[in-house]
């Protein structure tokens, strides 16, 4: 005879500190530094140094799903990552771009190098450090703490634009510098603030870069208007018109002149540079007789040279129409 015993199934759900959790807090420093670059000319790359200095930091971002406070009676794990997010380009007070390059990053790891706007330097430490320390594990934005860590300086170079006017410059460069603290309930937890989030963190640090430009190059005009005049639709094709501007340089220099189109052409012209004029017409644009849209000029000493921009009309009979033609391009002056 078989005896049946009732089976009991127990279901247990445990919550609290035994559940997996992660708390991430970012503390922003707010240093204001200045660096004197001295007298420079456009062909030089003046340098400046950013230093990580311990000090008071403010919480500017957090993401927490764990306990706010540790009482010292249970263990948790922590990892820290120092961040510096620095712009690749800034503008002078008179509207000229300065392009920032990395000269020496010390022991920092440079990441996300393909970003168009910012440099990302990271320094991680205290990986999987087990701790019992009592304290706040999820400080809120606006709360403060003191950071005592010290890290290597980062040295940058500045590429000056070829047509930067002479004079004194005081350029403010805002950037992010701070500490990511990550607390977790389990060994091996890893978290890094996403780069797109790091770019939006407040840039509460400021580098004031001071220098004096004592040698540059200047075009005689900031814009040129090339007029073809009133033409018959039957005789406009292949019509040529040009304008010349002079470029003066105070110092020896190699300048690359390159065109960028602002209006899309109607036709494909192979390697020739062209802009669209509307009504089925294009302009094939040349620089000093070269129709690829770029040329290089050399100044072996201070002086003035001429640059001729030419426009040759092109249209196919099946597409051209009468009307007012208009198009544009931007001429860049680029140092090597």
Swiss-Prot record:
It is found in: Secreted; Fimbrium. Belongs to the adhesin PapG family. InterPro entries: Adhesion_dom_fimbrial_sf, Adhesion_dom_sf, PapG_carb-bd_N, PapG_carbohydrate-bd_sf, PapG_chaper-bd_C. D-galactose binds at residues 79, 124-127. Disulfide bonds join 64-138, 217-249. CDD domains: PapG_CBD (cd00239). Its main location: secreted. Residues 1-20 form the signal peptide. Pfam families: PapG_C, PapG_N. Tip adhesin component of type P pili that plays a critical role in kidney infection through targeted interaction with the globoseries glycolipids containing the Gal-alpha(1-4)-Gal disaccharide present on uroepithelial cells. In turn, transcriptionally regulates host gene expression in kidney cells, leading to inflammatory pathway activation and renal tissue damage. Acts thereby as key determinant of invasive uropathogenic E.coli (UPEC), which cause pyelonephritis and urinary-source bacteremia. GO terms for cellular component: extracellular region; pilus. It comes from Escherichia coli. Gene3D superfamilies: Bacterial adhesin receptor binding domain, Fimbrial-type adhesion domain. One of its GO terms (biological process) is cell adhesion. Strains of E.coli that cause infection of the human urinary tract produce pap-pili (P pili) which are hair-like appendages consisting of about 1000 helically arranged subunits of the protein PapA. These pili mediate binding to digalactoside-containing glycolipids present on the epithelial cells which line the urinary tract. Keywords: Disulfide bond, Fimbrium, Secreted, Signal. GO terms for molecular function: carbohydrate binding. The keyword Disulfide bond applies. This is Fimbrial adhesin PapGII. Changing residue 127 to A: Abolished receptor binding activity. The gene is papGII.
